[in-house]
Amino acid sequence: MSHSVKIYDTCIGCTQCVRACPTDVLEMIPWDGCKAKQIAPAPRTEDCVGCKRCESACPTDFLSVRVYLCHETTRSMGLAY
């Protein structure tokens, strides 16, 4: 069962979500022209189990990473007709 994982622009690159994920869906990649890394824009969603630990670990006021479970994906992401 595939879930959608979305990384928003509010991400501060703290890596809390990356470390919280038990299945390594999220990963850090090099950021052009910077020593810091950023979260890869295309998470490996096929490994997502929908635990939402990444959401719980996010310290920003607006969750920078969101997991949309397969049954709520179209409604939550504003894709429903």
From Swiss-Prot:
Record has Translocase as a keyword: no
Protein name as catalogued: Photosystem I iron-sulfur center
Database matches in PANTHER family: PHOTOSYSTEM I IRON-SULFUR CENTER, PHOTOSYSTEM I IRON-SULFUR CENTER-RELATED
Enzyme class per UniProt: oxidoreductase
Self-association state and partner proteins as the record states: The eukaryotic PSI reaction center is composed of at least 11 subunits.
Gene3D superfamilies: 3.30.70.20
Catalyses which reaction(s): reduced [plastocyanin] + hnu + oxidized [2Fe-2S]-[ferredoxin] = oxidized [plastocyanin] + reduced [2Fe-2S]-[ferredoxin]
Physiological role: Apoprotein for the two 4Fe-4S centers FA and FB of photosystem I (PSI); essential for photochemical activity. FB is the terminal electron acceptor of PSI, donating electrons to ferredoxin. The C-terminus interacts with PsaA/B/D and helps assemble the protein into the PSI complex. Required for binding of PsaD and PsaE to PSI. PSI is a plastocyanin-ferredoxin oxidoreductase, converting photonic excitation into a charge separation, which transfers an electron from the donor P700 chlorophyll pair to the spectroscopically characterized acceptors A0, A1, FX, FA and FB in turn.
Binding site for [4Fe-4S] cluster 2: 21, 48, 51, 54
An annotated GO BP: photosynthetic electron transport in photosystem I
Cofactor section: [4Fe-4S] cluster
